Swiss-Prot record:
Residues 56-57, 106-108 are lumenal. InterPro entries: TB2_DP1_HVA22. Oligomer. It is found in: Endoplasmic reticulum membrane; Golgi apparatus membrane. The short lumenal loops between transmembrane domains 1 and 2 and between transmembrane domains 3 and 4 may impart a wedge-like configuration, thus deforming membranes. Residues 170-188 have a biased composition (Low complexity). This is Protein YOP1. Residues 1-35, 79-88, 128-188 are cytoplasmic. Residues 163-188 are annotated as: Disordered. The keyword Cell inner membrane does not apply.
Amino acid sequence: MAEIAGNLQRILQSLDRQFAGNKYLQEFERKTGFPKSYAIAGAGVAYLFIIFINVGGVGEILSNFLGFVLPCYYSLHAIKTTTTADDTELLTYWIVFAFFSVIEFWSKAILYWVPFYWFFKTIFLIFIALPQLGGASLIYHRVIAPLTDPYIAAGSQRKASGISSKMEQAAKGASARATGAASHQSSD
């Protein structure tokens, strides 16, 4: 329990540092005496609560909005980096997000069988979207890779063998032409 409290305290301190320059949060801190991180955490809890109670069906749009905006922010940063470490996590996230989008075609049936679906979906999307939690990597290695590797490996092998045979044919053709050209020059 002490470890959880310590982690929570570190997260709140990190939020205070990240939003140190925000004038609205500075005003909140000045007027209330509470740290900026409390306003951010409170807004986050209120957002999740609105999704949880799903007043007027707003849970769906709020869940999808958060599921798009947060990873989109990380994706825009990843595009500008030269490393590929974050790319796998983000691609995994977008694969799972797309899967949810297809499944939600039947959202009425899902909502009938899974109450609070939008809330659970939001929590899951946060888990796989935040790189600090490593959720996307976990989902990739435990679910996506075992399901897709047999098909992708087979396709890659066929493609590689197809490329190799084309290269061999081209090399033989070039060799035959070179031999023919050399024999043609020697007969001149």
